[in-house]
Amino acid sequence: MDINKLIHPEDAKALKALKSIPALPKLMEKVFQYGYDELAWSENVTTNLRLSEKQMPEIYNRLPPICERLGIPVPELYLQMSPIANSWTSGHKKVYIVVTLGLVKKLKEDELDAVLAHECGHILCQHVLYQTLANAIFTFGDFLTDSFVGVIGNAAMKPVKQALLLWSRASELTADRVACIFSPAMTLSRALARLDMIPKYIIEKMDFDVWASQGYDYEALRNGSAWNKIIHWMGDSDADHPYSPVRAYEAMRWEKTDTCNWLRSNPFTLEFQDDNTTKKNEEKNGANWSLSNVG
């Protein structure tokens, strides 16, 4: 099975547009030349708690089975002592996942599994490189822009940022698809509701199909009048994640597909073809991936 059947169409479309930006390769070169990747990792390793079989195994041990099923190396997992519920994946050279104490305290165990699978989805689908680029640009935007005189000017940075945000939103939908291989879309939706700060007593009474329909209604703006499309663009333009009802709708729709059901019920391994030779996941470098049944 071609991995493109797993990747959300909006993700593929946005990534193609992002890669078409002429200055992107030079921009990426500068970001890594300035050591942003190392800076972010050093801050992470000195301020967060690295989890393992010996360090809070009740959290860490949830990660390796997900990675094994996806055929990816197990990344380092860190716990940040922030009360704000959040998680992210970072690191181009050394990939790592961070979950916050607020997230662990807020989510039930099955919901935490969905979040970890979502983060592994970013690794599986090769999102981390562009996530690192986006984080660098939005963290050190002015400094980077000043250093790109003759390469990319201030005026050119805005469309780069917009393209990165568009892709970032779309990539979340792909990662949610990976989460749905391991967890029902309803579980993911409950986790999203908690991350939206919806109180527990409300979540217990919520009809998540109705909540997801709000996401459908919002996305329908894109297919309406020109003015509706502008409203949709204005609502999304500065966001790096889709709205949670949209994500719930997309996850529930994906859950009903044959592809999702097949991935849930069949063991598979990741392969890519290069001159008719199959290589291991960790040897890949921008090649075309496919999913193969090994059961």
Q: Where do the model's predicted regions map?
A:
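Alpha-helical membrane-targeting segments
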Residues: 21-36, 133-163, 221-238
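Active-site-proximal gating segments in proteases and membrane effectors
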Residues: 23, 83-89, 180-281
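Short helix/loop segments within enzyme catalytic domains
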Residues: 47, 54-60, 66-72, 150-221
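Residue-level signature of catalytic and energy-coupling elements of molecular machines
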Residues: 63, 99, 118, 175, ...
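Active-site His/Glu-centered metal-binding helix of metallohydrolases
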Residues: 107, 116-125, 174, 178
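Catalytic Zn2+-binding segment of zinc metalloproteases
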Residues: 120-140, 186
